[in-house]
Amino acid sequence: ETTSKKLVKVILLDLYVAWSADPDLMIMFSKNNNSYKAKSRYNELHIGKTIIKIVEGLVSNKIIEIKDGFNDRVKGIGFQSRIWASDTLKTKFRKAKFNQFQIQSHSEREPIVLRDENKQPVEYKDTETVSEMREVLSDYNKLLDQTHIDIYDLEKPLLIIGKGKKKMRLQINQQDKFVRRVFNKSNWNKGGRFYGGWWQRCPKDYRKRIMMDGMMTSEIDYSGLHVVLLYSQEGINYWAEINEDPYHLIGINNIDPNIDLRDAAKLLLLTAINADEELKAFQAFRSQAETGSPEKKMTNDQLKSILSALKRKHEPIAHKITSGAGIDLMKIDGQITEQLVKVFTYKYKCPILTVHDSYVVPFGYDRILFREMENAFEAITGTTHPVANHTTEYSDILEQEPNQTEDIHYHYSEPASQRHLKELE
């Protein structure tokens, strides 16, 4: 197979998967030669800059369409080029004798990513530790690939989330399930969180309705994880010794009464733990606030009054706030998540979805998850009895744990969602 033919196939299959998920979906495409390093570990298909000419040829022959991007370095704005299938190509897609479920990620796709200070991926040499992490991720991704993960009551496999400029389309499909670990600042001790899977971008209200192979799910999270981790670094067991809502404040009177003070305090504290200076924390807070919300309009003085109250409330860890401590905490919660992924993949052979400090498992495995979350937290931090909250409630609670000696498929024998069956037709 010639290189050109291979590249055409890659482009058309990518467009087919996008079209199958959402007929209006475009794919980002870089026209920068430097974006294509054929020998990079992050380029599993070894795609070189030749692909730019291939795309230009497909556009000139009206097989695909393109919207050119731009980059205004003065204003700091821009977007990458987008490509999508032409009407002629969409007609061909409708006649295809295969479906999106027969298209899978390349087996050599790199799940361990190391980024530099500019958040760009960098090459690295494998070590025994990295190889072990990769093996875990590879086995975990195989399990996810074999699991049908869906939101049961969607008429179309699509969510519109966010508002204003942050409004985006989130495809709920069986292709966006690949999970990787990302380390930062060219340092294996910085970061290490698990990223990937459409569920990480899915609002909590929709996560409650996730099904795995036709089974309902349950989600459990660590309460105030990063706050608890900071206290544990000071030798304090937060829930055993303090046991207060870490985000509850009183006496803040200079803000819009429509603002939920607890929610604002939570967002500000978490951004301040990640930021290395106050101004960056305030900017990050407003950036993450919803468009048009009163939180979006909060001034630096208003945010400073909340942050000062949080520092007084959390005096033992006040020195860690706006110190850039978040990246080190990401290493710890990445280690906790790795332990949970390993035990569910290898011991229970049961899929688990990760959302940084919360986890989703098939309903009936939630008590196992609760126990394993406690075990993982204690193993990594040395702190016992962390509080974990059930964030999904069901009236039809199962009273009996699954029998782990039985084959996993026995527990996943419920019928898949009706939309899933329609997609397979």
Pin down the residues of each PLM region.
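Helical catalytic core of nucleic-acid polymerases
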Residues: T3, V17, P23-G48, G197-T322
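Acidic, glycine-rich two-metal-ion catalytic cores of nucleic acid-processing enzymes
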Residues: Q80-L261, S358, M373
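Adenine-nucleotide phosphate-binding core of ATP-dependent small-molecule kinases
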Residues: H319-I336
